[in-house]
Amino acid sequence: MLLWLYHSLIMSDQNTASFYIRNIPIFGRFILAPMDGYTDSPMRKVCKNFGSSLSISEFLNGIDVTRGHPHFKTQSYFDESERPFIYQIYDDQPARFLAAALKLAEHQPDIIDINLGCSAKNVSNRGAGAGLLRNPAKIAEIAGSLVQNLPIPVTAKIRLGWDEQTENYLDIAHLLEDCGISLITVHARTRKQAFTGQARWSAITEVKQAVRIPVIGNGDVVSYADGIRMLDETGCDGVMIGRAAIGNPWIFSGSDRKDIDNGELLAVITSQLNLMVDLYGPGIAVPVFRKHLVRYLQGLLNTSEIRRNIFSIANPHNLLQEISELIDQRQPQ
């Protein structure tokens, strides 16, 4: 009953904003989380078609943005259909962080997001991402500088703290709000937990009750029903879905992937692969798409022979033919 009621409320009036990021209306409460190596423009477009209300770049290294990087063009690419669009940046140096944000602002995104949540050791151990949670003064310097110098809203994504002994999420939330940040996303785990253990949704509730700006919840949402439950239990303004959306854009619309018919499954796979070919060229698109394909074809790549055959195909057209034949064997449940 609760799932049906929330879905009806969410879908009833597409002309009414669910919440605002400063002056930007957001239509919908389910959002694709930024994931390094996954949430490129093709994946964002596919998920937006199914209901993701915001498009967020893969996290961008401030060093790469300011100095240049061979993959920067494709990593930073977005088009008008993805709006509202956010660039997410990580860095440990305030001056370079601002320089990167100003450079990215030239591409006319709608919002810039400060990554204070990445738990990867190569990021957090250098003091960037979740590593910044150990240095509130530097967070204030970065957030204040971006808010003062950018003409667009600035948001931030945080974790609960570096570890269970140094949780400071409420202090960081207040600090960010005081700096003029327009929205906070809370991944309800510590940096030490990374993606292990259970996300503590009660912390999302605490942040929502502590600040006046919108709060997005993140962590352990693996189904549409989980997202509805997070909204209900925490009072957050929106729900961010990450790993559960890989190969499953239907999670944003409330449909169960196992109920999707074969024709629609093939059409969505084809759409994402074609978008990737347009962005990267076939030589890069096909191998990069394989990690998505494994999730789309969950339960169908049952033998090493099937996997070897699928993963040996380099031509996009031939790959889609093989995928079509494989999907024909699938029985929607």
Task: Show the residue positions of the predicted features.
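Glycine-rich, positively charged N-terminal anion/phosphate-binding segment
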Residues: 12-20, 35-110
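Active-site-adjacent beta->alpha loops and helix N-cap segments on the catalytic face
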Residues: 65-72, 121-145, 192-205
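Active-site beta->alpha loop and helix N-cap motifs at the rims of alpha/beta catalytic domains
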Residues: 83-152, 159-166
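Non-cysteine beta-strand/loop elements that form the S-adenosyl-L-methionine
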Residues: 57, 111-119, 179-188, 240-245
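Conserved, mostly hydrophobic/aromatic
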Residues: 32, 47, 58, 87, ...
